[in-house]
């Protein structure tokens, strides 16, 4: 879909419709989008305009009604293929290896400590045998990520002993566990106070600069949007403008 080597991911003419009591409800109405390698891209707009739906499709958590996705990540196996049309196993493999996710309400498992939560993506990506064989190295990586996000001293705590900001830091560390190309963030500061939210802004900027990881951030937070390399505004299922 793109001849530009700076483009990592592209969506072309994405449509998404839901059936509600027998009526077709359009949410996305032909979205075109290119995501560049290593950029922070924010997507803003009112509730219900299709931001989270688009994020779920880009993250291969949902499928479009029509349209395609092209991805030029580290694995050439998927180059030139419509990754929206992959079977469930290939989608899962690509998603777990190349994408990370951060949500508004953290989604940390309460029965695991912070370190174990961060290790989860590595467990999912590997067989039990492979995980056990590499557990020491993977644990070192998880600990290093917790150090980077500033909560290494909380590694043995259960999530319910963390503040909201600390839980989101743990979720960000978890999203980076498999060294993803892209992290998709759905309202990452929406459940935080202003000061804590600003610290999360700074952390995303820092991680992007240090690791080169790309971030796609759906947000109502104009402060977070202003820190992005680009901001796109959605209205009625389409992008309205581009700010570079």
Positions of PLM-derived features:
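ABC-family P-loop ATPase nucleotide-binding domain
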Residues: 1-17, 241-244
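ABC family nucleotide-binding domain
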Residues: 8-227, 231-234
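H-loop (His-switch) and adjacent beta-strand-loop-beta switch element
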Residues: 231-243
């Amino acid at each position: 879909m793109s001849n530009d080597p700076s483009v990592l991911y592209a969506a072309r003419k994405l449509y998404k419709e839901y059936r509600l009591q027998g009526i077709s409800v359009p949410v996305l109405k032909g979205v075109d989008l290119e995501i560049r390698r290593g950029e922070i891209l924010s997507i803003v707009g009112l509730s219900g305009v299709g931001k989270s739906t688009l994020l779920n499709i880009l993250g291969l958590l949902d499928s479009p009604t029509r349209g395609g996705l092209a991805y030029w990540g580290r694995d050439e196996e998927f180059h030139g293929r419509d990754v929206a049309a992959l079977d469930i196993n290939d989608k899962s493999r690509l998603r777990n290896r190349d994408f990370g996710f951060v949500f508004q309400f953290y989604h940390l498992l309460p029965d695991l400590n912070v370190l174990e939560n961060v290790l989860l993506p590595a467990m999912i990506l590997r067989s039990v045998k492979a995980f056990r064989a590499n557990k020491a190295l993977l644990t070192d990586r998880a600990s290093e990520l917790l150090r980077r996000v500033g909560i290494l001293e909380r590694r043995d705590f259960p999530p319910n002993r963390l503040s909201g900001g600390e839980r989101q830091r743990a979720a960000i560390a978890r999203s980076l566990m498999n060294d993803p190309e892209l992290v998709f963030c759905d309202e990452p500061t929406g459940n935080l106070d202003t000061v804590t939210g600003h610290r999360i802004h700074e952390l995303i900027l820092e991680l992007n600069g240090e690791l080169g990881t790309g971030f796609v951030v759906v947000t109502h937070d104009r402060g977070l949007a202003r820190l992005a390399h680009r901001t796109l505004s959605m209205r009625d299922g389409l992008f309205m403008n581009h700010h570079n």
